[in-house]
Amino acid sequence: MRRYETIFIADPDLSPENQAQLFEKATTLIDANSGVLVEFDEWGTRRLAYEIRKKPRGHYVRLDFCGDGATVQGLENAFRIDERVLKFMTVFLSENADPEALRQAIAEEKEKKAEGQAAADAAPADGDDEAPKQPAPASDDDAPKQPETEAGSDETEAAAADKSDDNA
């Protein structure tokens, strides 16, 4: 199976029930067209770079799925017809993808991230292990200046002499 990623922008003015219905429709379309949903990632409402249908904001959703061309075509056709979808884009990710292996890898990654977050939350609670913080210099003027040496100019003169010998 091929792996695809579709990001679509839904109308931000939709009620939560209507949003849930749209998201359910997208996931069932993938299943109906012999596809397998790997990950459903809701990014939330964000400001658009430019207005789409006179709306400055949009609700972003990312679908990671495996399927074939018919799966992508069915999903995109439904998005073109549905007025609740402002924009969408599908990208091909890989040729031979195993949906179960991808799900396991994503689950493991989320576990590691959760463990790392839990460790990060626990570390500031101790507070005694941290080194005292020193202020950084405000600008380059405060930094100590290195005296300029003439060694750099000798090197450039030697390089120029070598170059002139090569040309002669």
From Swiss-Prot:
A GO cellular component entry from the record: ribonucleoprotein complex
Disordered: region residues: 103-168
Keyword Ribosomal protein recorded: yes
Compositionally biased tracts (Basic and acidic residues): 106-115
Keywords: Ribonucleoprotein, Ribosomal protein, RNA-binding, rRNA-binding
Alphabetized InterPro entries for the sequence: Ribosomal_bS6 (IPR000529), Ribosomal_bS6_CS (IPR020815), Ribosomal_bS6_sf (IPR035980), Ribosomal_S6_plastid/chlpt (IPR020814), Transl_elong_EF1B/ribsomal_bS6 (IPR014717)
Biased composition, class Low complexity, residue ranges: 116-125
Name of the molecule in the record: Small ribosomal subunit protein bS6
Organism in which the protein naturally occurs: Desulfosudis oleivorans (strain DSM 6200 / JCM 39069 / Hxd3)
Gene designation: rpsF
